[in-house]
Amino acid sequence: MMKREVINKTRGTSLGAVRFARTFMSRFRGLMLRRDVETGLVLEIPVGRGRYGSGIHMFFMLVPLDVLFVDGDMRVVDSVTLRPWQIYNPRKPARYVIELREGKIRDSGTRVGDTIEFRDLQS
């Protein structure tokens, strides 16, 4: 599975490496039961799912995560740090849900309205 880097184009900062969860099982498992979240995860949400269809849960998570909700225009529409066992629905519908190690949003200076892009990394 190819890794990509999440870049905040607005601020010129990196949010780190991610993998895309493209299968049902990879989306279902997500980052559950992992202590090491050096590589984040991107969930691609089907078009037309709406705000509640973009929501996530933190069931069976062992560590907090930073989560970015990004629309089809690659703009951040919401961001949050979630603790294990929380449920969250974004303020606006998202096309991509990006799960990252806690602190990545703060360290990159990422804010709602910023533009994000994915760049290919070497495996």
Curated annotation (Swiss-Prot):
InterPro entries: DUF192, Saro_0823-like_sf, UPF0127. Pfam families: DUF192. Belongs to the UPF0127 family. HAMAP family: UPF0127 (MF_00263). This is UPF0127 protein MTH_1377.
